[in-house]
């Protein structure tokens, strides 16, 4: 059965960010920037072209200008620092294990698809897998910080999972999964953090433990990207689109689930690879300056700008030094939303309190 992909909001919207300045085809969006003594300047940003992420750029693909004058590579010692020094990328896979799934003859295909997904995304991010049925609680299949052996054991347990409640607590599971993702990212020891939730389900909410609107509000209020994969005819596009605000795929049966997981996984990986942490040593020693970073790729160009104060700058710069990015909660929340949605952070809105009704069970 062929893969049927439906995007309520095209994936391009997710990765099309507003550039501070752009050339013919590249868009650069500044996520964070900072200076540090003795003369370090670091900028964390995303690169896109035609609403698609641009990966694998090298330090030599960027030109750095200060006050519109090119800074030589020998002088700047510009380098691409590992984004992991400043950012954390977490993905939570939420798998429907209600009776219609756990008691079906398609469980093997679903389990294999989940294992494939974790292997694919886990090379770039930390990945956790949680299951839900009709119960109030989520079930931790594999957490964000397990050993490799624990991960393998957890994923293998999907195939032998026994549903405690045959109903489907989809709404409650999504709200609680977002809470788990928030909690995990909150414990990360880096200033830049973003998460992704991927929901796999074969049906609509039947348990009615959490109202639909509460789930929708939680998804919309979350700074994280949320994808949905629906299998079968019970779940409709309307429900999938409200869960998968970043995009969704509906397939006819579980035999196509591997392709669906693969497509979502590829998008997540590419989305991660669009981020760059460019660091260099400024030749300035005093005064306020404008730095312009220009990316050049296959004839296309794009630019971003950042103003900084070089007061007290002096020799001795190491461009590989981790940048002192802001870690305050409010600033981080705006950055997370911008990174997850691909849009500039909106004006502050009243916070929607979506309480996680339930807890996580570690029993399989």
Regions found by a protein language model. Give the residues of each.
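C-terminal "exit" segments of structured domains
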Residues: 35-39, 254-348, 352
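DG-centered beta-turn motif at the end of beta-strands
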Residues: 62, 96-98, 110, 129-132, ...
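Von Willebrand factor
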Residues: 137-139, 146, 150-195, 206, ...
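Second-shell loop/turn segments in exported
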Residues: 50, 96-107, 116, 137-142, ...
């Amino acid at each position: 059965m062929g893969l049927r992909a439906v995007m309520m909001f095209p994936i391009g919207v997710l990765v099309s960010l507003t550039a501070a300045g752009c050339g013919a085809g590249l868009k650069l969006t500044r996520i964070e920037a900072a200076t540090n003594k003795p003369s370090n300047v670091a900028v964390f940003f995303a690169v896109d072209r035609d609403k698609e992420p641009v990966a694998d750029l090298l330090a030599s693909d960027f030109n750095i200008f200060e006050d519109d004058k090119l800074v030589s590579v020998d002088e700047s010692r510009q380098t691409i620092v590992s984004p992991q020094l400043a950012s954390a990328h977490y993905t939570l896979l939420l798998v429907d294990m209600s009776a219609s799934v756990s008691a079906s003859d398609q469980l093997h295909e679903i389990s294999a698809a989940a294992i494939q997904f974790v292997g694919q995304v886990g090379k770039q991010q930390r990945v956790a897998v949680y299951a839900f049925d009709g119960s109030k609680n989520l079930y931790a299949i594999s957490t964000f910080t397990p050993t490799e052996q624990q991960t393998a054991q957890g994923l293998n347990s999907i195939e032998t999972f026994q549903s405690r409640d045959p109903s489907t607590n989809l709404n409650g599971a999504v709200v609680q999964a977002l809470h788990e993702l928030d909690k995990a990212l909150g414990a990360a020891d880096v200033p830049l953090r973003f998460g992704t939730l991927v929901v796999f389900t074969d049906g609509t909410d039947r348990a009615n433990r959490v109202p639909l609107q509460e789930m929708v509000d939680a998804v919309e209020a979350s700074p994280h990207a949320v994808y949905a994969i629906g299998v079968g005819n019970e779940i409709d596009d309307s429900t999938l689109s409200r869960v998968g605000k970043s995009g969704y795929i509906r397939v006819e049966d579980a035999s196509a689930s591997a392709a669906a997981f693969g497509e979502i996984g590829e998008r997540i990986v590419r989305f991660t690879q669009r981020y760059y942490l460019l660091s260099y040593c400024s030749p300035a020693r005093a005064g306020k300056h404008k730095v312009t970073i220009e990316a050049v790729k296959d004839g296309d160009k794009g630019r971003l700008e950042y103003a900084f104060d070089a007061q007290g700058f002096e020799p001795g710069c190491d461009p590989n030094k981790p940048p002192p990015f802001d870690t305050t909660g409010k600033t981080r929340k705006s950055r997370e939303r911008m990174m997850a949605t691909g849009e500039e952070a909106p004006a502050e809105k009243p916070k929607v309190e979506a309480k996680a009704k339930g807890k996580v069970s570690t029993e399989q």
